[in-house]
């Protein structure tokens, strides 16, 4: 898949605000501060398209980005640690679960996992949830540039042991772009 055009479309705080299900949706999900927004910016080549922050919990809404006029990339709030109150975190959790359960337009879910901390309990729970719903998902091991080759291989083996039903696993660096071509090639199978 080649990305020619990427624009912010809309943000929603409730399922009632979601756009019509006219385009396939590729969903970015993962723990807070795993690099969902950075990955989105890297893939599209549009710096600042998705807001990034070193503070966990920056993404607080479901953010839609229209890609090539006929696909949505959907950036979801992170799960796990975030610098917000319990009530807001509970709202995010309910929103995330309801969206993934009910949205028919979801073509693929990308589960982003920090390469330095693969297979955390919250990531395994997300994969189990997606498998229960029979949602196709791929795993993106982010922050790949922060590992040595030996650490990268060990993290990959560990991730593979927990993700037998993942359609693919891609090691990705938003900093260098490593993994970008491979990931975009996978999208071809889910956006036709």
UniProtKB/Swiss-Prot annotation:
Record domain EngB-type G: where: 22-192
Binding site for Mg(2+): 37, 59
Residues that, per the record, bind GTP: 30-37, 57-61, 75-78, 142-145, 172-174
Cofactor: Mg(2+)
Domain of life from the UniProt record: Bacteria
CDD domains, A to Z: YihA_EngB
A GO term from the CC aspect: cytosol
Protein keywords: Cell cycle, Cell division, GTP-binding, Magnesium, Metal-binding, Nucleotide-binding, Septation
Biological role stated in the UniProt entry: Necessary for normal cell division and for the maintenance of normal septation.
Similarity annotation: Belongs to the TRAFAC class TrmE-Era-EngA-EngB-Septin-like GTPase superfamily. EngB GTPase family.
Name of the protein: Probable GTP-binding protein EngB
Species this protein is from: Chlorobium limicola (strain DSM 245 / NBRC 103803 / 6330)
Gene name for this UniProt entry: engB
